[in-house]
Curated annotation (Swiss-Prot):
Any GO molecular function: dehydroquinate synthase activity
This protein's record includes keyword Oxidoreductase: yes
Function of the protein: Catalyzes the oxidative deamination and cyclization of 2-amino-3,7-dideoxy-D-threo-hept-6-ulosonic acid (ADH) to yield 3-dehydroquinate (DHQ), which is fed into the canonical shikimic pathway of aromatic amino acid biosynthesis.
Assigned EC number: 1.4.1.24
EC category name: oxidoreductase
Chain segments annotated as transmembrane: none
Protein name: 3-dehydroquinate synthase
Key words of the record: Amino-acid biosynthesis, Aromatic amino acid biosynthesis, NAD, Oxidoreductase
Entry's Gene Ontology BP terms: amino acid biosynthetic process; aromatic amino acid family biosynthetic process
Keyword Amino-acid biosynthesis: yes
Record's catalysed reaction(s): 2-amino-2,3,7-trideoxy-D-lyxo-hept-6-ulosonate + NAD(+) + H2O = 3-dehydroquinate + NH4(+) + NADH + H(+)
Amino acid sequence: MKKKSVWIKADEGGWEQQKERITTGLESGADCVLVNPGDVGKVRELGNIPVATFGRDNKSGAEIIVVGKRGEGDGTKPLPLETQGSLDINAATLLRDKEVAVGGYVIIKDKRYEQFAAEMGKVCDFLIVTGTDWKVIPLENLIAELQRYDVKIIFGVKNAEEARLAFKTLETGADGVLLNSGNIQEIKDTIQAAREMENERTELESAVITRVEPLGMGDRVCVDTCNLMQKGEGMLIGSQASGMFLVNSESDDSPYVAARPFRVNAGAVHSYIKIGDKTRYLSELRTGDAVTIIDSKGRQREGFVGRVKIESRPLMLIEAKAGNRTLSAILQNAETIKLVGKDGNPISVAKLKKGDEVLVRLEEGARHFGKKIEETIIEK
């Protein structure tokens, strides 16, 4: 679930015109706005969003300084014959040496500008490139050229359709887009396109329940999110990183308690939770942490922790078999705690029995500090 960012370009025209773009971006979840130095303070008054600005120093207070406007990058000044003689590259290098986040801005007019952009990207945190009448080929080349460098490629687009194309180029696509549009709907659609690209599907399969055994008292973790979940949506939880159960949110009413669709009563404190392509311990989660919400079709989206509650409750051991692999989870022993069945319908652990089929996620390889590694490991 690689994050795709959307920057809003708001450096041309009057402030009132740009203000509408910025406000829409803020309300829709844009990741950054690119403005002129004199407008940085005005953006701060509108809301809390990272700001990038054009310049060669960090006096504006913006989080990111972008080099290239009115320079070599946009064609105002001629390209140098040698990289060492580039005013833009030298300015970007000086900023980065001062530990300032720096972006390079290049309008790709021909092959020479593409080559210049590649060199600029090697000294920047962000490389912002826009095309003239050609798009996919230079972006492919830049992604391939810079894949070994710690730089995020932001591609200039005018609408959501161009953004989707940029996100899908090669296997990785652009890291983000810089949207230059005053159309309110295009801003919303482009941000939505970015979120859709992040929400790749997770492959789920069914496992057969082989053991359901009540345990004694233990500490379990309840994750209250800032998001409302539907039937069949929840989180992947397990005692082994190699296999996790889809634990349903408390999105259904019960005879005992009203629905709390923001909650996943997730499991014992030792349990793993899958977040993106990593795992964490449930007991590590804190307010504001990102989590991955997954439904029975494997569709995933990002959520955020609003509150974590660790309380002593009666526990239940659940084991299941998928092929020749055994996986387990320890959940609270209560009617409201549910796994997701093979058909997508929740099954209460209070009614779970041997032979029932539930949805799980299987992983290959071991984990080290939550990251997948190639290593032999046995978890029981």
